[in-house]
Amino acid sequence: MTDAATLSTAGFDLTPPTEAERERLEANLTAEEARVLLHHGTEAPFCGGLLGEKSPGVYGCRLCGLPLFKHETKFESGTGWPSFYAPFAEDHVVGVRDTSYGMVRIETRCARCDSHQGHVFPDGPAPTRLRYCINSVSLQFVKAGAPLPDPLHRGDKIT
């Protein structure tokens, strides 16, 4: 953790990457990952690699590794994108008003690195009635029991 770390309610370091760290992380992205994560793109529906993933585990930010969603909150929405009814921790995902394409929506971003993840809609299942509609390419799946990726060397662990 950094000296002046901002910890999430789940104990993860939310300190944004430095400019040098961000450049290093961005250099490892594919063109499609960069288009979605950095330029607020959307992958085509029904083609994402994590859409059918049903294994126990955690879905983390593809850019910085912060855990964003738990497998227990994933559900089949029929929209063509992985959908979740709650984030890993409320303060791991940030909502930003998005008025692009003549619509009013809430864009979801990683609270640590500010990368685009998808959108949240008020049409999900109980208990939250929310649907976090997330691009597969924005996420990396970590099977239960496997160590979390730690590209920023923050020492974050699920306890």
UniProtKB/Swiss-Prot annotation:
Q: Which reaction is catalysed here?
A: L-methionyl-[protein] + [thioredoxin]-disulfide + H2O = L-methionyl-(R)-S-oxide-[protein] + [thioredoxin]-dithiol
Answer yes or no on keyword Membrane.
no
Q: Look up keyword Oxidoreductase and say if it applies.
A: yes
Write out the GO biological process terms: protein repair; response to oxidative stress
Pinpoint the MsrB domain residues: 22-144
Q: What is its EC number?
A: 1.8.4.12
Listed Pfam families: SelR (PF01641)
Record-linked InterPro entries: Met_Sox_Rdtase_MsrB (IPR028427), Met_Sox_Rdtase_MsrB_dom (IPR002579), Mss4-like_sf (IPR011057)
Can you list the GO cellular component terms from the UniProt entry? cytoplasm
Q: How is the cofactor bound?
A: Binds 1 zinc ion per subunit. The zinc ion is important for the structural integrity of the protein.
Task: Kindly list the positions annotated as binding Zn(2+).
Answer: 61, 64, 110, 113
A GO molecular function assigned to this protein is:
peptide-methionine (R)-S-oxide reductase activity
Give the UniProt family note: Belongs to the MsrB Met sulfoxide reductase family.
Q: What HAMAP family does the record point to? A: MsrB (MF_01400)
Q: What is this protein called?
A: Peptide methionine sulfoxide reductase MsrB
- Organism per entry: Caulobacter vibrioides (strain NA1000 / CB15N)
From the broadest rank down, the organism's phylogenetic lineage runs: Bacteria, Pseudomonadati, Pseudomonadota, Alphaproteobacteria, Caulobacterales
